[in-house]
């Protein structure tokens, strides 16, 4: 899938604009602070109903405007189009529309418009808390395993019930046992989907990484959230007193993690910034390959400040891999000349100059 058209109104400093992007490579260039990243933010808002720059949406809404709106016409992989719209009012009201109908959740957007973001904060995938890596993992499972979301919802409900009981002791023993059983069943299902996904992801990630950078010995492993040699019901029983003292369930899929190690060390502790960026890119690109295999469609990639942290050789290698995905890519940079040699002649490349919130399409830089 790809965006055929996108209309942006009152997003940060951007002037109202309608863009008809290339189905492949789109480069947004201009000075720092011109609004390039705000274009990526608008696409992200359309696909996930949230910003990647702020946990609050009020800062996204242009000063003195009551609401921001993003509309997109999506070319579907199976043919035909779908119209998506997201509107956020400063007062807090949020509207998601899909083909003229109100949507119930942002998950419906995510299914229609799978997005991959690579930006300066992407280092957090390696350096940050396990929650960030779980989100990465579950994004991938969600897009390849249709049974994942119902199981995840059951898991969340069972966890809420158990944690409430741990804090307040409001469940009778029979109800407590029933919710523990439901928690264990949902956990086993989630764990199976995650393990299968990692099994498929690892060889694709390793191959992709080898085309970007030489990092012999880097390993990716999955920790499910409890001892691999014990059943979860046994772990829950043995940790009950501790769970009651803490007020929440300590073992289970909600504690899962992905571990990247190099020479027995946490990879984030010894890799340079450039190497970390390439590892994250390899993970994101590998996910895109799995989405394409499972759905016969493509992710849309948002790459903020692609040239940063990378020398010319690695910039070219990253551009080549993004190009080989045959998906739609939106890239920001200050100097588009740095990407001049990154693409094959036959690949459609659209250039957009961004200056003080105004966006102008310019000529293909290879012409």
Curated annotation (Swiss-Prot):
GO terms for cellular component: cytoplasm. It comes from the Bacteria. One of its GO terms (biological process) is DNA replication. Coiled coil: none annotated. One of its GO terms (molecular function) is single-stranded DNA binding. It is found in: Cytoplasm. SUPFAM superfamilies: P-loop containing nucleoside triphosphate hydrolases. Disulfide bonds: none annotated. It holds the Pfam family SMC_N. ATP binds at residues 30-37. Its main location: cytoplasm. Keywords: ATP-binding, Cytoplasm, DNA damage, DNA repair, DNA replication, DNA-binding, Nucleotide-binding, SOS response. Belongs to the RecF family. The RecF protein is involved in DNA metabolism; it is required for DNA replication and normal SOS inducibility. RecF binds preferentially to single-stranded, linear DNA. It also seems to bind ATP. This is DNA replication and repair protein RecF. It comes from Pseudomonas putida (strain W619).
